[in-house]
Each structure stands twice: as C-alpha cells, then as structure tokens.
C-alpha cells in the first residue's frame, strides 16, 4: 500500500477536488481522476479517465478514494474491483443497505480491503499518505495508531495526541454507517507489523461490536475509549450506525473490555498512553 498509485473517484466535483488537492500537497501519490463525462481533461494536472479500467491500465494505480454521491457508489466500486483496484477508501455516506451488502459481497469475493463508507479515511504521516478528509494541522509523526468509528472523536484524539507529544503512526476512521466494509483481519494483515506503531487507541461507541475483535490481541499495547455511555436505548445518536440496543448494550461492552484493557474515562486522559 505504501508505494501504490491512487485513483481519485470524484476529483472533478467540488468536494473531491478540494480534498484531493490537500492530499497531493501533503505528498500523497494521486495520479488520476474518474469521470466519463469529462474524460481527457485535466484537473490538478491529473488526467481524467472514462473508466477505472483505463486508469488502472495506463497509470497502474491499485488504490481508489471515493468522493462521489452515494447513489452512484455501488457501480463505481464494483467497477473499481473488476478493474484491478485492491484497496478502496469510501468517504461517501448513506449508501443503501442493499448496495452495501452487494459491495461487501464483491469485496469478500475478490479479497479487497474496503474502508468506509462514511469514513474520514486513513492517514499515515511518516509516508505522507492521506486518503480521505483528515485535517492535517495536528498531524505529526509519532507512535500512536488511532482506530475509530467516529470521525469527530478521531480529530479530537489527533489534536490531543499532538498536545501530549505522542504523535500518530496511523489514523483510521472505519466508517459510521450501519454496515461498514472493513475486514479487520485483512486490514491488520497490511499493518499489524507496522514498526512505527507502539500503542493503539481504539475509539468505540454504541451500536458496534467491532471492539470485541481486539479483546485477545496482545502484539501491541491497546487502550480504549468508549463513547455514548449515557445514550438512551433504541435512539440513533449522531449517525446511522450509532444506536444503543439490548443486543449490544454499551455497559456490557465496557465490562467485557475492562477484563483485558485500560479504558479511558475521556479522551483528555490520552496522556496515560505511554
């Protein structure tokens, strides 16, 4: 992943253009854009292709970043997969459940690493890789891997990690929609031996079981922060994936995690991570 070229799907739109420009200035190796209506044109001095296949064939890109409206995501993502893209980072939110089930099916079938949807993306400061919408003001090279379901809390953790001179080795927003595409085992097959990472901060919340996949992990030092402890049952909080219910009660989750790891009472306790 660290040396691969990147296709920006949605580069020609205002949102995609803005964040692609920031990523390029940061140092990310984005080489092309995708828009069949604007094929042959240049945006940010990057060629715009009519299809993922042509972009992969000509530029040899293996990663795509998705900035397009959710209605079009399924077809573009499946086209990415068939064209040879191996890693897909989806910023778009509110992809329908049916479309996400199809996307997950194809990602599993073709062994694709999919991050999102409704994700701020991923940033790796040491390698100047920014795939998504992370603000770079507080990004500094360090040894803390921040893994979060909430984009806003990720940004706060980044700011506090800089303030406490921890820095970041890698920051990942897994996505806030009800169905996310991330395969934890596949993601860690890429990054689990990432030498720059000393500690991992997992920011969990209501409505998710993904934290449970870390309970028996011992290769790195892990710290947790779980938000939403006072949230009412059966009420969506913030985004569609954040809902507390009797099948995944947050207090039971915290009790289970406490058996294995330290849970921060609030993110200001990030200074406890050493």
Model-derived features: positions:
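Catalytic-core regions of core metabolic enzymes
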Residues: 1-274
